[in-house]
Amino acid sequence: MSELPIVSIVTFLPLVGAALLLCVDRRREAAIKHLAFGVSAVTFLVSLGLYGNFQLDVPGMQFSERALWITWLGAEYHVGVDGISLLLVLLTTFLTAVAILSSYAAVTTAVKEYMVCLLLLETGMLGVFVALDLVLFYVFWEGMLIPMYFLIGIWGGPRRIYATIKFFLYTMAGGVLMLVGIIALYFLSGGRPGGEYTFDLLKLSALDLPFQAQAWLFLAFAVAFAIKVPMFPFHTWLPDAHVEAPTAGSVILAGVLLKMGTYGFLRFALPLFPDATRYFTPLVSWLAIVGILYGALVSMVQPDLKKLVAYSSVSHLGFVMLGIFALTVQGVEGAILQMINHGLSTGALFLLVGMLYERRHTRMIQDFGGLARIVPIFTAAFLIVTLSSIGLPGLNGFVGEFLILVGTFRVNVLYAALATAGIILAAVYMLWMFQRVMFGPVTQEANRGLVDLTAREMAVLAPVLALIVLIGIYPQPFLRTTEASVAQLLARVQERKELRAESREIRAESRERRVQGREPRAANWTWHANETEGEGRDGR
Protein backbone atom coordinates (compact mmCIF):
# COMPACT_ATOMS: atom_id res chain seq x y z
CA MET A 1 0.00 0.00 0.00
CA SER A 2 2.93 2.34 0.64
CA GLU A 3 3.66 2.38 -3.12
CA LEU A 4 0.21 3.79 -3.85
CA PRO A 5 -0.45 7.55 -3.66
CA ILE A 6 -2.56 6.78 -0.62
CA VAL A 7 -2.63 10.35 0.71
CA SER A 8 -4.01 11.61 -2.60
CA ILE A 9 -6.50 8.75 -2.71
CA VAL A 10 -7.83 9.63 0.74
CA THR A 11 -7.95 13.33 -0.10
CA PHE A 12 -9.70 13.16 -3.45
CA LEU A 13 -11.93 10.11 -3.03
CA PRO A 14 -14.75 12.30 -1.65
CA LEU A 15 -14.32 14.61 -4.65
CA VAL A 16 -14.77 11.63 -6.97
CA GLY A 17 -17.83 10.64 -4.95
CA ALA A 18 -19.27 14.14 -5.36
CA ALA A 19 -18.77 13.88 -9.12
CA LEU A 20 -20.59 10.54 -9.15
CA LEU A 21 -23.49 12.02 -7.21
CA LEU A 22 -23.94 14.64 -9.90
CA CYS A 23 -24.72 11.82 -12.32
CA VAL A 24 -27.54 10.43 -10.17
CA ASP A 25 -31.14 11.53 -10.72
CA ARG A 26 -32.07 13.91 -7.89
CA ARG A 27 -35.37 12.03 -7.42
CA ARG A 28 -33.50 8.93 -6.25
CA GLU A 29 -32.87 10.33 -2.79
CA ALA A 30 -32.27 6.98 -1.11
CA ALA A 31 -29.61 6.06 -3.68
CA ILE A 32 -27.97 9.47 -3.25
CA LYS A 33 -27.78 9.06 0.53
CA HIS A 34 -26.41 5.53 0.31
CA LEU A 35 -23.80 6.50 -2.28
CA ALA A 36 -22.64 9.50 -0.24
CA PHE A 37 -22.35 7.41 2.91
CA GLY A 38 -20.63 4.61 1.01
CA VAL A 39 -18.00 6.99 -0.37
CA SER A 40 -17.38 8.52 3.07
CA ALA A 41 -17.15 5.07 4.67
CA VAL A 42 -14.66 3.85 2.06
CA THR A 43 -12.61 7.01 2.58
CA PHE A 44 -12.50 6.28 6.30
CA LEU A 45 -11.41 2.69 5.68
CA VAL A 46 -8.63 3.84 3.34
CA SER A 47 -7.46 6.33 5.97
CA LEU A 48 -7.28 3.43 8.44
CA GLY A 49 -4.89 1.79 5.97
CA LEU A 50 -2.83 4.96 6.14
CA TYR A 51 -2.69 4.58 9.91
CA GLY A 52 -1.86 0.88 9.67
CA ASN A 53 1.21 1.55 7.52
CA PHE A 54 2.37 4.57 9.52
CA GLN A 55 5.79 4.19 11.22
CA LEU A 56 5.39 5.54 14.74
CA ASP A 57 9.09 6.12 15.40
CA VAL A 58 9.66 8.27 12.30
CA PRO A 59 9.23 11.96 13.20
CA GLY A 60 9.17 13.41 9.68
CA MET A 61 6.59 13.35 6.93
CA GLN A 62 5.52 9.96 5.59
CA PHE A 63 3.70 8.87 2.42
CA SER A 64 4.99 12.07 0.80
CA GLU A 65 3.91 12.78 -2.75
CA ARG A 66 5.45 15.54 -4.83
CA ALA A 67 4.71 16.74 -8.36
CA LEU A 68 5.26 19.92 -10.35
CA TRP A 69 2.24 22.20 -10.27
CA ILE A 70 2.88 25.88 -11.04
CA THR A 71 6.47 25.60 -12.23
CA TRP A 72 7.20 29.27 -12.92
CA LEU A 73 5.99 30.18 -9.42
CA GLY A 74 7.76 27.38 -7.60
CA ALA A 75 4.51 25.92 -6.26
CA GLU A 76 4.21 22.14 -6.08
CA TYR A 77 1.64 19.51 -5.36
CA HIS A 78 3.31 18.27 -2.17
CA VAL A 79 1.36 16.26 0.39
CA GLY A 80 2.18 13.94 3.27
CA VAL A 81 1.33 13.18 6.87
CA ASP A 82 3.09 12.98 10.20
CA GLY A 83 1.77 11.91 13.59
CA ILE A 84 -0.01 15.23 14.11
CA SER A 85 -1.86 15.42 10.81
CA LEU A 86 -2.60 11.68 10.68
CA LEU A 87 -4.94 11.79 13.68
CA LEU A 88 -6.78 14.76 12.19
CA VAL A 89 -7.16 12.96 8.86
CA LEU A 90 -8.72 10.03 10.71
CA LEU A 91 -10.99 12.38 12.67
CA THR A 92 -12.12 14.06 9.44
CA THR A 93 -12.97 10.87 7.58
CA PHE A 94 -14.70 9.37 10.63
CA LEU A 95 -16.87 12.39 11.48
CA THR A 96 -17.83 13.00 7.85
CA ALA A 97 -19.23 9.48 7.58
CA VAL A 98 -21.07 9.97 10.88
CA ALA A 99 -22.44 13.35 9.75
CA ILE A 100 -23.73 11.95 6.45
CA LEU A 101 -25.43 9.03 8.20
CA SER A 102 -27.04 11.41 10.68
CA SER A 103 -28.53 13.43 7.81
CA TYR A 104 -30.66 10.63 6.39
CA ALA A 105 -33.85 11.84 8.08
CA ALA A 106 -32.91 15.45 8.83
CA VAL A 107 -32.46 16.66 5.24
CA THR A 108 -35.50 16.47 2.97
CA THR A 109 -34.85 19.23 0.41
CA ALA A 110 -32.11 19.32 -2.24
CA VAL A 111 -30.64 16.10 -0.86
CA LYS A 112 -28.33 15.64 -3.83
CA GLU A 113 -26.75 19.09 -3.50
CA TYR A 114 -26.47 18.67 0.28
CA MET A 115 -24.49 15.44 -0.02
CA VAL A 116 -22.29 16.91 -2.75
CA CYS A 117 -21.45 19.83 -0.45
CA LEU A 118 -20.53 17.48 2.40
CA LEU A 119 -18.18 15.43 0.20
CA LEU A 120 -16.57 18.55 -1.29
CA LEU A 121 -16.10 19.88 2.22
CA GLU A 122 -14.39 16.64 3.23
CA THR A 123 -11.86 16.95 0.41
CA GLY A 124 -11.15 20.56 1.41
CA MET A 125 -10.58 19.66 5.05
CA LEU A 126 -8.36 16.69 4.22
CA GLY A 127 -6.33 18.86 1.86
CA VAL A 128 -5.63 21.34 4.65
CA PHE A 129 -4.23 18.59 6.87
CA VAL A 130 -2.00 16.96 4.24
CA ALA A 131 -0.75 19.95 2.21
CA LEU A 132 2.99 20.68 2.53
CA ASP A 133 3.09 23.52 0.02
CA LEU A 134 1.77 26.90 1.17
CA VAL A 135 -0.07 27.67 -2.06
CA LEU A 136 -1.70 24.25 -2.03
CA PHE A 137 -2.58 24.72 1.63
CA TYR A 138 -4.15 28.10 0.89
CA VAL A 139 -6.22 26.67 -1.98
CA PHE A 140 -7.67 23.99 0.29
CA TRP A 141 -8.07 26.46 3.19
CA GLU A 142 -10.16 28.86 1.14
CA GLY A 143 -11.79 26.18 -1.01
CA MET A 144 -13.54 24.50 1.90
CA LEU A 145 -15.35 27.79 2.61
CA ILE A 146 -17.55 27.38 -0.47
CA PRO A 147 -19.37 24.15 0.50
CA MET A 148 -19.66 25.31 4.12
CA TYR A 149 -21.14 28.58 2.90
CA PHE A 150 -23.88 26.71 1.03
CA LEU A 151 -24.49 24.20 3.84
CA ILE A 152 -25.34 26.99 6.28
CA GLY A 153 -26.87 29.38 3.76
CA ILE A 154 -29.28 26.90 2.12
CA TRP A 155 -30.04 24.27 4.77
CA GLY A 156 -29.61 26.47 7.85
CA GLY A 157 -32.08 28.09 10.24
CA PRO A 158 -34.10 31.31 10.00
CA ARG A 159 -31.05 33.62 10.38
CA ARG A 160 -28.85 31.55 8.11
CA ILE A 161 -28.01 34.38 5.70
CA TYR A 162 -26.64 36.59 8.48
CA ALA A 163 -24.69 33.69 9.99
CA THR A 164 -23.30 32.64 6.62
CA ILE A 165 -22.11 36.09 5.63
CA LYS A 166 -20.55 36.64 9.05
CA PHE A 167 -18.73 33.30 8.90
CA PHE A 168 -17.55 33.99 5.36
CA LEU A 169 -16.32 37.53 6.05
CA TYR A 170 -14.43 36.57 9.21
CA THR A 171 -12.70 33.64 7.56
CA MET A 172 -11.95 35.53 4.36
CA ALA A 173 -10.44 38.43 6.31
CA GLY A 174 -8.09 36.04 8.07
CA GLY A 175 -7.34 34.31 4.79
CA VAL A 176 -6.25 37.58 3.17
CA LEU A 177 -3.79 38.23 5.99
CA MET A 178 -2.41 34.72 5.63
CA LEU A 179 -2.05 35.18 1.87
CA VAL A 180 -0.01 38.33 2.45
CA GLY A 181 2.17 36.37 4.87
CA ILE A 182 2.63 33.54 2.37
CA ILE A 183 3.71 35.98 -0.37
CA ALA A 184 6.11 37.75 2.00
CA LEU A 185 7.59 34.44 3.09
CA TYR A 186 8.06 33.46 -0.56
CA PHE A 187 10.08 36.59 -1.33
CA LEU A 188 12.07 36.30 1.89
CA SER A 189 13.05 32.75 0.96
CA GLY A 190 14.50 33.77 -2.40
CA GLY A 191 15.66 37.28 -1.69
CA ARG A 192 18.83 36.30 0.16
CA PRO A 193 22.24 35.05 -1.05
CA GLY A 194 21.87 31.48 -2.27
CA GLY A 195 18.16 31.53 -1.52
CA GLU A 196 15.46 29.68 -3.42
CA TYR A 197 12.00 31.01 -4.11
CA THR A 198 9.73 28.32 -2.73
CA PHE A 199 6.43 27.64 -1.03
CA ASP A 200 7.59 24.27 0.30
CA LEU A 201 6.91 24.04 4.03
CA LEU A 202 9.89 21.81 4.79
CA LYS A 203 12.33 24.13 3.00
CA LEU A 204 10.82 27.24 4.56
CA SER A 205 11.11 25.68 8.02
CA ALA A 206 14.89 25.59 7.57
CA LEU A 207 15.12 29.36 7.01
CA ASP A 208 16.78 31.52 9.65
CA LEU A 209 14.58 34.60 9.50
CA PRO A 210 15.35 37.75 11.51
CA PHE A 211 13.05 38.39 14.42
CA GLN A 212 11.28 41.40 12.87
CA ALA A 213 10.24 39.32 9.87
CA GLN A 214 9.17 36.44 12.10
CA ALA A 215 7.06 38.72 14.27
CA TRP A 216 5.08 40.26 11.42
CA LEU A 217 4.64 36.94 9.63
CA PHE A 218 3.57 35.24 12.85
CA LEU A 219 0.87 37.86 13.36
CA ALA A 220 -0.39 37.46 9.78
CA PHE A 221 -0.70 33.70 10.13
CA ALA A 222 -1.84 33.78 13.76
CA VAL A 223 -4.83 36.06 13.13
CA ALA A 224 -6.05 33.75 10.34
CA PHE A 225 -5.68 30.71 12.58
CA ALA A 226 -7.13 32.44 15.66
CA ILE A 227 -10.28 33.33 13.70
CA LYS A 228 -10.71 29.72 12.67
CA VAL A 229 -10.12 28.26 16.18
CA PRO A 230 -11.83 30.64 17.21
CA MET A 231 -9.92 32.39 19.96
CA PHE A 232 -11.25 35.26 22.00
CA PRO A 233 -11.91 37.97 20.73
CA PHE A 234 -12.36 36.51 17.21
CA HIS A 235 -15.09 34.08 18.29
CA THR A 236 -18.30 35.99 17.60
CA TRP A 237 -19.02 34.26 14.28
CA LEU A 238 -19.11 30.80 15.87
CA PRO A 239 -22.35 30.84 17.92
CA ASP A 240 -24.35 32.22 14.99
CA ALA A 241 -22.89 29.68 12.56
CA HIS A 242 -23.58 26.78 14.92
CA VAL A 243 -27.13 27.80 15.76
CA GLU A 244 -28.12 28.24 12.12
CA ALA A 245 -26.18 25.32 10.61
CA PRO A 246 -27.89 21.97 10.00
CA THR A 247 -26.87 19.17 12.36
CA ALA A 248 -24.26 17.68 10.02
CA GLY A 249 -22.84 21.16 9.42
CA SER A 250 -22.48 21.73 13.17
CA VAL A 251 -20.82 18.33 13.63
CA ILE A 252 -18.27 19.06 10.90
CA LEU A 253 -17.81 22.67 12.00
CA ALA A 254 -17.12 21.80 15.64
CA GLY A 255 -15.47 18.46 15.02
CA VAL A 256 -13.06 19.33 12.23
CA LEU A 257 -13.15 22.91 10.91
CA LEU A 258 -12.18 24.49 14.22
CA LYS A 259 -9.19 22.12 14.42
CA MET A 260 -7.84 23.64 11.23
CA GLY A 261 -6.96 26.73 13.25
CA THR A 262 -5.13 24.90 16.03
CA TYR A 263 -3.45 22.68 13.43
CA GLY A 264 -2.27 25.80 11.63
CA PHE A 265 -0.43 26.97 14.74
CA LEU A 266 1.25 23.57 15.11
CA ARG A 267 2.13 23.13 11.45
CA PHE A 268 3.13 26.69 10.52
CA ALA A 269 3.50 29.15 13.41
CA LEU A 270 5.79 27.08 15.61
CA PRO A 271 8.23 25.65 13.03
CA LEU A 272 8.34 28.68 10.70
CA PHE A 273 8.52 31.40 13.34
CA PRO A 274 9.99 29.84 16.51
CA ASP A 275 11.43 33.07 17.93
CA ALA A 276 8.20 34.97 17.37
CA THR A 277 6.28 32.06 18.88
CA ARG A 278 8.25 32.36 22.10
CA TYR A 279 7.87 36.12 22.12
CA PHE A 280 4.09 36.03 21.69
CA THR A 281 3.55 33.05 24.00
CA PRO A 282 2.40 35.16 26.99
CA LEU A 283 -0.11 37.07 24.84
CA VAL A 284 -1.56 33.93 23.26
CA SER A 285 -1.65 32.16 26.63
CA TRP A 286 -3.59 34.97 28.27
CA LEU A 287 -6.03 35.12 25.37
CA ALA A 288 -6.48 31.36 25.71
CA ILE A 289 -7.22 31.71 29.43
CA VAL A 290 -9.69 34.52 28.80
CA GLY A 291 -11.37 32.29 26.21
CA ILE A 292 -11.55 29.39 28.68
CA LEU A 293 -13.22 31.47 31.38
CA TYR A 294 -15.32 33.66 29.08
CA GLY A 295 -16.66 30.70 27.11
CA ALA A 296 -17.57 28.88 30.32
CA LEU A 297 -19.31 31.86 31.91
CA VAL A 298 -21.31 32.70 28.79
CA SER A 299 -22.30 29.04 28.39
CA MET A 300 -23.88 29.12 31.85
CA VAL A 301 -26.51 31.67 30.79
CA GLN A 302 -27.45 30.30 27.37
CA PRO A 303 -31.11 29.31 26.93
CA ASP A 304 -30.42 27.51 23.62
CA LEU A 305 -28.78 24.07 23.72
CA LYS A 306 -26.86 24.62 20.50
CA LYS A 307 -25.57 28.01 21.54
CA LEU A 308 -24.47 26.57 24.90
CA VAL A 309 -22.44 23.89 23.13
CA ALA A 310 -21.03 26.51 20.74
CA TYR A 311 -19.72 28.70 23.55
CA SER A 312 -18.36 25.64 25.32
CA SER A 313 -16.19 25.10 22.23
CA VAL A 314 -14.59 28.50 22.78
CA SER A 315 -13.69 27.34 26.28
CA HIS A 316 -12.45 23.88 25.26
CA LEU A 317 -10.32 25.19 22.41
CA GLY A 318 -8.83 27.73 24.79
CA PHE A 319 -7.38 24.69 26.59
CA VAL A 320 -5.95 23.44 23.30
CA MET A 321 -4.25 26.78 22.61
CA LEU A 322 -2.90 26.93 26.16
CA GLY A 323 -1.39 23.46 25.75
CA ILE A 324 0.21 24.31 22.40
CA PHE A 325 1.84 27.48 23.71
CA ALA A 326 3.06 25.81 26.88
CA LEU A 327 5.74 24.50 24.49
CA THR A 328 6.18 21.36 26.57
CA VAL A 329 5.82 17.74 25.49
CA GLN A 330 2.88 17.15 27.83
CA GLY A 331 1.18 20.38 26.81
CA VAL A 332 1.44 19.86 23.05
CA GLU A 333 0.59 16.14 23.14
CA GLY A 334 -2.36 16.91 25.40
CA ALA A 335 -3.49 19.68 23.04
CA ILE A 336 -3.45 17.36 20.02
CA LEU A 337 -5.33 14.66 21.91
CA GLN A 338 -7.81 17.26 23.14
CA MET A 339 -8.41 18.34 19.54
CA ILE A 340 -9.52 14.78 18.83
CA ASN A 341 -11.49 14.58 22.08
CA HIS A 342 -13.32 17.82 21.42
CA GLY A 343 -14.20 16.68 17.92
CA LEU A 344 -15.77 13.51 19.29
CA SER A 345 -17.48 14.93 22.37
CA THR A 346 -18.80 18.15 20.88
CA GLY A 347 -19.70 16.41 17.64
CA ALA A 348 -21.73 13.92 19.68
CA LEU A 349 -23.42 16.75 21.59
CA PHE A 350 -24.53 18.36 18.34
CA LEU A 351 -25.78 15.01 17.09
CA LEU A 352 -27.87 14.54 20.23
CA VAL A 353 -29.21 18.09 20.15
CA GLY A 354 -30.09 17.59 16.49
CA MET A 355 -31.96 14.37 17.27
CA LEU A 356 -33.88 16.17 19.98
CA TYR A 357 -34.68 19.03 17.59
CA GLU A 358 -36.02 16.61 14.96
CA ARG A 359 -38.53 15.39 17.56
CA ARG A 360 -39.56 18.68 19.18
CA HIS A 361 -38.45 21.41 16.74
CA THR A 362 -37.06 23.47 19.59
CA ARG A 363 -33.68 23.75 21.27
CA MET A 364 -34.72 25.91 24.21
CA ILE A 365 -33.74 24.32 27.53
CA GLN A 366 -36.94 25.58 29.18
CA ASP A 367 -39.01 23.49 26.74
CA PHE A 368 -37.69 20.25 28.18
CA GLY A 369 -37.51 18.50 31.53
CA GLY A 370 -38.11 14.98 32.77
CA LEU A 371 -36.87 13.34 29.57
CA ALA A 372 -34.99 10.64 31.49
CA ARG A 373 -38.27 8.79 32.12
CA ILE A 374 -39.42 9.10 28.52
CA VAL A 375 -36.24 8.46 26.48
CA PRO A 376 -33.85 6.50 28.75
CA ILE A 377 -31.45 5.35 26.00
CA PHE A 378 -31.13 8.90 24.70
CA THR A 379 -30.55 10.10 28.27
CA ALA A 380 -27.79 7.54 28.85
CA ALA A 381 -25.99 8.59 25.67
CA PHE A 382 -26.38 12.26 26.59
CA LEU A 383 -24.96 11.57 30.05
CA ILE A 384 -21.84 9.86 28.69
CA VAL A 385 -21.15 12.73 26.31
CA THR A 386 -21.82 15.34 29.00
CA LEU A 387 -19.39 13.68 31.42
CA SER A 388 -16.84 13.41 28.63
CA SER A 389 -17.16 17.12 27.93
CA ILE A 390 -16.43 18.05 31.54
CA GLY A 391 -13.39 15.76 31.70
CA LEU A 392 -14.56 12.94 33.96
CA PRO A 393 -11.75 10.40 34.60
CA GLY A 394 -12.29 7.28 32.54
CA LEU A 395 -13.57 9.23 29.54
CA ASN A 396 -11.59 10.91 26.79
CA GLY A 397 -11.88 14.51 27.98
CA PHE A 398 -9.91 13.85 31.15
CA VAL A 399 -6.69 12.66 29.49
CA GLY A 400 -6.22 15.66 27.23
CA GLU A 401 -7.07 18.25 29.87
CA PHE A 402 -4.83 16.57 32.44
CA LEU A 403 -1.83 16.58 30.09
CA ILE A 404 -2.45 20.21 29.17
CA LEU A 405 -2.58 21.24 32.83
CA VAL A 406 0.59 19.27 33.63
CA GLY A 407 2.43 20.82 30.68
CA THR A 408 1.21 24.30 31.58
CA PHE A 409 2.02 23.88 35.28
CA ARG A 410 5.65 23.19 34.37
CA VAL A 411 6.05 26.66 32.88
CA ASN A 412 3.49 28.84 34.66
CA VAL A 413 1.53 27.92 37.78
CA LEU A 414 -0.86 30.87 37.43
CA TYR A 415 -1.91 29.82 33.93
CA ALA A 416 -2.63 26.30 35.15
CA ALA A 417 -4.61 27.53 38.16
CA LEU A 418 -6.83 29.79 36.05
CA ALA A 419 -7.38 27.02 33.51
CA THR A 420 -8.43 24.69 36.32
CA ALA A 421 -11.15 27.16 37.22
CA GLY A 422 -12.44 26.71 33.67
CA ILE A 423 -12.82 22.97 34.27
CA ILE A 424 -14.90 23.64 37.38
CA LEU A 425 -17.12 26.05 35.47
CA ALA A 426 -17.54 23.48 32.69
CA ALA A 427 -18.89 21.00 35.21
CA VAL A 428 -21.33 23.64 36.44
CA TYR A 429 -22.86 24.60 33.11
CA MET A 430 -22.89 21.10 31.59
CA LEU A 431 -24.39 19.33 34.61
CA TRP A 432 -26.90 22.13 35.17
CA MET A 433 -27.97 21.86 31.54
CA PHE A 434 -28.29 18.07 31.84
CA GLN A 435 -30.32 18.37 35.04
CA ARG A 436 -32.79 20.84 33.51
CA VAL A 437 -33.29 18.81 30.33
CA MET A 438 -33.38 15.27 31.71
CA PHE A 439 -34.67 15.49 35.29
CA GLY A 440 -37.55 17.13 37.10
CA PRO A 441 -41.23 17.00 36.18
CA VAL A 442 -42.47 16.76 32.59
CA THR A 443 -43.85 20.28 32.14
CA GLN A 444 -44.52 20.17 28.38
CA GLU A 445 -47.19 17.78 27.12
CA ALA A 446 -45.41 17.52 23.76
CA ASN A 447 -42.49 15.82 25.52
CA ARG A 448 -44.61 12.88 26.68
CA GLY A 449 -44.88 11.54 23.16
CA LEU A 450 -41.15 11.57 22.39
CA VAL A 451 -39.72 8.34 21.03
CA ASP A 452 -36.34 6.98 22.04
CA LEU A 453 -33.37 6.51 19.73
CA THR A 454 -34.01 4.58 16.55
CA ALA A 455 -31.69 1.86 15.26
CA ARG A 456 -30.13 4.28 12.76
CA GLU A 457 -29.53 6.90 15.44
CA MET A 458 -27.92 4.32 17.72
CA ALA A 459 -25.72 3.26 14.80
CA VAL A 460 -24.66 6.90 14.41
CA LEU A 461 -23.86 7.39 18.10
CA ALA A 462 -22.39 3.99 18.98
CA PRO A 463 -18.95 4.39 17.32
CA VAL A 464 -18.55 7.90 18.72
CA LEU A 465 -19.42 6.76 22.25
CA ALA A 466 -17.10 3.78 21.89
CA LEU A 467 -14.17 6.05 21.00
CA ILE A 468 -15.01 8.38 23.90
CA VAL A 469 -14.70 5.46 26.32
CA LEU A 470 -11.72 3.86 24.55
CA ILE A 471 -9.58 6.99 24.61
CA GLY A 472 -10.46 7.57 28.25
CA ILE A 473 -9.39 4.06 29.24
CA TYR A 474 -6.48 3.50 26.86
CA PRO A 475 -5.12 6.71 25.26
CA GLN A 476 -1.63 5.32 24.61
CA PRO A 477 -2.09 4.48 20.88
CA PHE A 478 -3.16 8.05 20.18
CA LEU A 479 -0.35 9.60 22.23
CA ARG A 480 2.17 7.21 20.70
CA THR A 481 1.16 8.36 17.22
CA THR A 482 2.07 11.98 17.93
CA GLU A 483 5.10 11.40 20.17
CA ALA A 484 7.89 11.53 17.57
CA SER A 485 6.37 14.45 15.64
CA VAL A 486 5.85 16.52 18.78
CA ALA A 487 9.42 15.85 19.92
CA GLN A 488 10.75 17.03 16.55
CA LEU A 489 8.57 20.15 16.62
CA LEU A 490 9.64 21.19 20.11
CA ALA A 491 13.28 20.41 19.32
CA ARG A 492 13.10 22.97 16.52
CA VAL A 493 11.79 25.65 18.90
CA GLN A 494 14.33 24.73 21.59
CA GLU A 495 17.19 24.74 19.09
CA ARG A 496 16.33 28.29 18.06
CA LYS A 497 16.20 29.35 21.71
CA GLU A 498 19.67 27.93 22.36
CA LEU A 499 21.08 29.57 19.24
CA ARG A 500 19.69 32.94 20.33
CA ALA A 501 21.15 32.47 23.82
CA GLU A 502 24.56 31.61 22.36
CA SER A 503 24.37 34.61 20.04
CA ARG A 504 23.59 36.92 22.97
CA GLU A 505 26.56 35.59 24.92
CA ILE A 506 28.90 36.20 21.99
CA ARG A 507 27.58 39.74 21.55
CA ALA A 508 27.90 40.43 25.27
CA GLU A 509 31.53 39.31 25.25
CA SER A 510 32.18 41.40 22.15
CA ARG A 511 30.68 44.51 23.77
CA GLU A 512 32.77 43.92 26.88
CA ARG A 513 35.94 43.74 24.81
CA ARG A 514 35.03 46.94 23.00
CA VAL A 515 34.47 48.72 26.28
CA GLN A 516 37.90 47.57 27.43
CA GLY A 517 39.40 48.76 24.15
CA ARG A 518 40.52 45.31 22.97
CA GLU A 519 38.28 45.14 19.89
CA PRO A 520 37.25 47.74 17.29
CA ARG A 521 33.61 48.74 17.21
CA ALA A 522 31.41 46.74 14.78
CA ALA A 523 29.69 48.59 11.96
CA ASN A 524 26.06 47.88 12.76
CA TRP A 525 24.34 45.80 15.46
CA THR A 526 20.77 46.89 14.76
CA TRP A 527 19.55 43.51 13.52
CA HIS A 528 21.11 41.68 16.48
CA ALA A 529 19.59 44.11 18.94
CA ASN A 530 16.22 43.44 17.53
CA GLU A 531 16.86 39.72 17.67
CA THR A 532 17.06 39.85 21.44
CA GLU A 533 13.46 40.95 21.46
CA GLY A 534 12.55 37.51 20.17
CA GLU A 535 12.77 35.97 23.62
CA GLY A 536 9.41 35.59 25.30
CA ARG A 537 8.45 38.02 28.03
CA ASP A 538 8.24 35.20 30.52
CA GLY A 539 11.74 33.99 29.62
CA ARG A 540 10.62 30.88 27.78
Predicted regions and their residues:
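Central hydrophobic cores of alpha-helical transmembrane segments in multi-pass inner-membrane proteins
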Residues: 8-23, 37-52, 89-103, 121-123, ...
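Predominantly late transmembrane helices and immediately cytosolic-facing juxtamembrane segments
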Residues: 232, 346-349, 417-449
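Juxtamembrane/interfacial segments at transmembrane-helix boundaries in multi-pass membrane proteins
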Residues: 54-76, 176-235, 240, 265-283, ...
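Low-complexity, proline/glycine-enriched hydrophobic segments characteristic of transmembrane helices
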Residues: 477-540
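Transmembrane helix-loop-helix hairpins at membrane boundaries of multipass inner-membrane proteins
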Residues: 1-6, 20-116, 192-208
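C-terminal ends of transmembrane helices
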Residues: 18-29, 96-108, 150-159, 229-243, ...
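Structural signature of hydrophobic alpha-helical transmembrane segments
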Residues: 2-13, 81-92, 134-147, 214-225, ...
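Alpha-helical multi-pass transmembrane bundles of energy-transducing inner-membrane proteins
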Residues: 27-30, 113-120, 124-213, 298-311, ...
